[in-house]
């Protein structure tokens, strides 16, 4: 019987995959790739709606998953970062959200199971990727009306629940609520996860990953990491971590803070350094690995991956780094 992610994370540092968007860019896809024949009737541009590729170019998404698994990833994320009715409304494809999530999970699940069967001693897991959406519950998009909100907590929670029910039915091993910039959005997602698990009768670990927006270590909605932890302590959280924001070196002080205070497993998936003036990431896989090595040697993490600018070449540096390394021990696990 395959071990669960909860069992394996206590034994060794797990490797999460890298960026999906960065990998998709390498395929130089055109509008017709995103649209396909099926969505010919949809108005507006669909190029850039990466999640839709699970339906129109599943071969590309599966190829990316395979590259990350070949690189040594223990956990691959579904291509569902924006697969909610809230986010898909901009593309006029919100009615396909359930199907998109089911398709995305199947693409990842089939490959994860294939690689687990090849080497049962290194089981592979699927994390359902849940992004923050393009709306915020706690801030106004209208500078002239601070009280205005683009959507309500209930609307967002319902949208998340629909996504998560499909993920759970599809067979994810965990739900990863990531790139959190608004704690109220995250709380809606946590509530939705709890409701989705009740509705489906399937329980999986809930992982959180926060994005700090400045060198002061606050989220976009203004919370410190300590305040964020206090805001979610009521929930049954498996892991908490940091992603995006900065490169590994710049992210380290915030990771140290999180590792010292959070009673959960700790994750980190930094960007490939900081973007240059053209928005590109210049840091090499070897350079990033050199910075990440400090996380591992200092016992800061349980799960390590990559965010913006990273590819399978970056993730391929990790297996040698984590081999034999001791995972982080939080206060609750000591």
For the regions a language model picked out, list residue spans one by one.
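Domain-level signal for soluble alpha/beta catalytic cores
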Residues: 1-332
